[in-house]
């Protein structure tokens, strides 16, 4: 999980800042609170998605068609909301690194320690290799969606 986060953290932070989002530690805490609530709402409502729907979205080349398909088939599902939690944790890690550029030591950073709670939560929701693959794919799709959307 930490490997996935380190691979995407800077991309997540840049996408958030491009959309005008605050990536400070306090904003990340509030975002995690919101994303966690949205995750449990999706889970309680059983808004699941299939690996097939994810694979279909991966094949869409046209950006407008992709956004429409994402909003229709994947947005606000359990997998989408879990990807959001991971993206916020990754953004927080990248922001912590950027704020402490020269002397950044993740193992000693309180922001990284706090964000690791979100990572632990995500790991607790994963039941096996299929869930890991779904999450990996959803994070990639969600990042594409975030980079294309205009909010």
Give the residues covered by each predicted segment:
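Flexible "arm" and connector segments at domain edges
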Residues: 1-151
């Amino acid at each position: 999980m930490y490997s996935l986060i380190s691979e995407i953290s800077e991309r997540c932070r840049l996408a958030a800042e491009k959309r005008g989002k605050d990536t400070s530690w306090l904003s990340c805490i509030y975002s995690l609170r919101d994303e966690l609530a949205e995750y449990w709402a999706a889970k309680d409502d059983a808004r699941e998605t299939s690996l097939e729907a994810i694979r279909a979205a991966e094949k869409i080349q046209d950006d407008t068609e992709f956004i429409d398909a994402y909003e229709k088939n994947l947005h606000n599902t359990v997998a989408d909301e879990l990807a959001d939690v991971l993206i916020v944790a990754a953004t927080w890690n990248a922001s912590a690194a950027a704020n402490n550029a020269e002397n950044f030591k993740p193992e000693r950073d309180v922001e990284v320690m706090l964000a690791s709670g979100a990572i632990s939560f995500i790991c607790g929701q994963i039941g096996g290799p299929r869930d890991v693959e779904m999450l990996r794919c959803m994070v990639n799709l969600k990042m594409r969606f975030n980079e294309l959307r205009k909010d």
